[in-house]
């Protein structure tokens, strides 16, 4: 009803019409479950897991052209009748889009920043906010800040002199 939805991996599968597990590989017994019905997709689970590093270009408006690098790790194959979320360099399609509902198998969507910026700008405009007023920082900078916060927390919780001594190192 006008609210954007993004499903990644299992979330993408659940946004579809059905999830078919003919061998019980995911659920422990053969069964077919109804999905949320927000995307025109059908997923069939299998014993084999797909693991791949991938690059793709977003096809879905309003993010079309954003370059992605990420990975897939999932069981099953999803057949999509809707528009693709992205295209692989070989022309293959990835994911599915219907209206403001987006589904993809690609983990790491927001690691490069191009999709993050496009998505944030789109959401700002939908809410009547000028994207240039939004305080966005590059993903790598954010990640470093979060690691610094984590490191400070670990240092505060440990006797670092004892840790350095146990490692045979001098305190820096």
Where are these regions (language model features)?
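Hydrophobic, well-ordered secondary-structure elements that form the walls
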Residues: 36, 73, 107
């Amino acid at each position: 009803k006008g609210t954007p939805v993004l499903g990644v991996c299992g979330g993408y599968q659940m946004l579809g019409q059905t999830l078919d597990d003919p061998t019980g590989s995911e659920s422990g017994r053969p069964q077919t479950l109804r999905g949320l019905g927000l995307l025109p997709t059908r997923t069939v689970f299998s014993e084999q897991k797909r693991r791949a590093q991938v690059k793709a270009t977003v096809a879905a408006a309003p993010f079309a052209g954003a370059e992605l690098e990420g990975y897939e790790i999932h069981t099953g194959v999803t057949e999509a009748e809707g528009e693709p979320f992205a295209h692989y360099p070989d022309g293959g399609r990835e994911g599915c889009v219907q209206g403001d509902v987006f589904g993809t198998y690609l983990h790491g969507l927001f690691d490069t920043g191009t999709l993050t910026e496009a998505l944030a700008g789109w959401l700002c405009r939908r809410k009547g906010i000028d994207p240039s007023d939004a305080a966005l920082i590059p993903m790598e900078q954010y990640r470093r800040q979060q690691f610094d916060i984590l490191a400070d927390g670990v240092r505060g919780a440990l006797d670092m002199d004892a840790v350095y001594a146990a490692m045979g190192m001098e305190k820096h």
